[in-house]
Amino acid sequence: MDQFKTHVLGLASLSLALLVALPARGASLQKVNQSEWGADGLPSYVNMYIYVPDKLATKPPIVVAPHHCQGNGQGTFSEMSSLVSIANTSGFIMIFPEATGQNCWDAGSTRSLNHGGGGDTGAIVQMVKYTLAKYGGDAGRVYSVGGSSGGIMTEALLGVYPDVFMAGVSLMGVPCGCWAEGYNDVTGTGSSAQWSGPCGGGNVTKTGQQWGDLVRSYYPGYTGHRPRLQHWHGTADTILSYKNMAEDIKEWTNVLGLSETPSGTDTPKRGTTRQFWKSACGYTVYEAFSMDGVGHAVPFDGPAVAAYFGLDRAGGQDPETAACPGAVPGGSDTGGAGGATGAGGAGGEAGTGGAGGEVGAGGAGGEAGAGAGGAGGVTVSGSGGSAGSGGAMDTASGGANGQDASAGTGDSTGGEGSSSGCSCAVGNDARDAGAQAGFLLAALGLLLGRQKRRPR
């Protein structure tokens, strides 16, 4: 009998040890078949990947992250691991669209530059609508962030679908509609000629009114809220010329109804100059960051992006909505009437770190730097794992700091340091540890039953 008890206790101890040793399975990147999210007339080469954290906020916000040329959804998930980690703690959903069939995004065809016209922009918007419906997302908190071709697509999404997107961050992008210059609707996107064409070379110039009219023509009759935007560009960029920064300023200040003269200029960190423009209610709605001597390799800073979107904390309103309640629609995926600007308090500016960066919670508003940490140097941990040190949105050179050395069209993104420690459960089954525990306990019960039937 004593031997039997010893055997049972040993089995129980072993089972307990196995339960303790079970690996924690978290959320993972999942592909969604186009038959589930798509619609007739959308490009067949566009794929959808989605990351849904284990713990979602009530009415979770959504961040779209279009990749660079030669990129894909899986790669962008790794490159933006610091933002994914924040999604785990703040409970927002991330969509990683993929256009590997074309290598780069179509931000120049008449299909993509036409509200409801289909194309790549229409495909991404369809992904957003699917996610809003399936997960009960917040239609007033949909954002986009991307670098190079992903930055170009971000600006196209904001210009063509202002009723869907609240804000965006464009790294090394170009003005909405610029990519249409010389675009061949027959051959489509991905053509190397586009990268050496007039827009890529910074040779497309228009007045602010011309740029604004172009954007407004993509959604005729729309009078609602226009998304806010951050644009980052290196002064030594030879892939997508820095000259596009001046055109971007002319375009978006006109679209947003602002003067081309900035509300202010500062230096949030050494070598980076920020110009910012405030709306009538005092909230910063457009920012242009120039990085001295930087080429096509602007660093991705997940914590700063999250702060700009107001996603560095769980729940709540978009920061612009909170600062200017009368100027921003309450949140409908069809846009709403918009409302006049100028309502709300003095606001506060949403800078991206460094000295100042207002939170803009409506009221007197003081500046409160949105992001700490320099370019690509922040490590953030969340339930999905620890993000590696930041890399750079890079092109052909690569090298240190997690940068990806892939070349191709000269439009690839340096990694988010995925080799330096992202422990996110990418592509693994998120199996329930409770089910595994039940299996072990059942096995233990079977062994105990057999022991009882043995003669003593």
Swiss-Prot record:
GO molecular function annotation: carboxylic ester hydrolase activity
Membrane topology: Single-pass membrane protein
Active site: S148, S149, S386, S412, S419
Annotated transmembrane regions: 433-449
Residues making up the signal peptide according to the UniProt record: 1-26
Top-level lineage group: Bacteria
Annotated spans, Disordered: 382-426
Biased composition (Low complexity): 392-410
Phenotype for S148A: About 30% decrease in acetyl esterase activity. Loss of PHB depolymerase activity
Comment field on protein domains: Comprises a single domain but contains five nucleophilic elbows. Each nucleophilic elbow forms a local active site with varied substrate specificities and affinities, thus possessing one or more enzyme activities.
Name the record gives this protein: Multifunctional esterase
Organism: Sorangium cellulosum (strain So ce56)
